[in-house]
Amino acid sequence: MTASPYIAVVGGVGRNIAHNLALLGAKVKLITALGADDGAKRIEASCADLGIDLSDSLYVPDGATSTYLFLADSNGDMALAMNDMAIYEHLTPTFLETKLTTLNAAALVVLDTNLSAESIRYLGEHCTAPLFADPVSAAKAGKLEPILGRLHTLKPNRMEAELLSGVTVTDEASLYRAADTLLAAGLQRVFISLGADGVLAADHERKIHLHNLPARMVNTTGCGDAFMAAVARAFLDGADLETAAKRGLAASAIAMESADTINPAMSLTAVAERIQ
């Protein structure tokens, strides 16, 4: 019997980061928008299994839980994608204001740009917890520009870094200039994902270009989410820049080896072993 080419998994950038953080031993609360449908039930069940707290999420009875469809090529890379994320428009500044006490009590808050520009700006202006941001895509990265100075950590890819810094990256020198520009905007740390060329990690004391770790490539979708989760967990552990970047690369390598967006083998132990 031929295996089905279609695989349906629980996903979403923010949820994937939350899932990986839970596997890495962090206590996680996920604030998202859910419909009254099978997609929401699957997310609820997945989060319950992982101990992820959904109690502050918004339920939209007539809304459809967000969906994301992608087609992978023979190398496991995304060839085509489409999505329906209209439900996230319900995560308004007014709604987020009701969650501000919870957000400000967190050790860190991770946001992605599936939120509206207005909601992202609200978080930047009112959330006092360290903010980590994933630009998600070049099309959505611009939403972060007004709050760059209020972010602690940013994880863009090369194209997103170019857009947010205004620096065209053509070589190592221009890559470093892009990082400097982003740090000058107020960031504490930036991790610029370079695909097959690894990552440039930078803070106000140093910059380091690290190469990818060996991995058996099965599926690259979810690697960036795993990287962000590991970097966030490293922050919680008080890790320095290089250690955080190495953990991110290790988590990304582990994620790459699973057909699912999340590798169930993800753990702090697995990350540490991959680095050695």
Feature locations, PLM:
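Short, glycine-/polar-rich solvent-exposed loops and beta-turns at beta-strand/coil boundaries
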Residues: 61-63
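Aromatic/hydrophobic pocket-lining residues that form π-stacking "cages" and hydrophobic walls in ligand
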Residues: 17, 43, 120-123, 251
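Short alpha-helix plus adjacent loop in nuclease-associated cores
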Residues: 65-68
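Acidic active-site catalytic centers that drive phospho-/nucleotidyl reactions
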Residues: 16, 134, 160, 219, ...
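Glycine-rich phosphate/adenosyl-contacting loop at the front of the ribokinase-like
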Residues: 1-33, 38-49, 211, 216-217
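Conserved phosphate-binding/catalytic region of the ribokinase-like
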Residues: 140-141, 145, 172-276
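Ribokinase/PfkB-type carbohydrate-kinase core domain
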Residues: 45-59, 70-206, 267-270
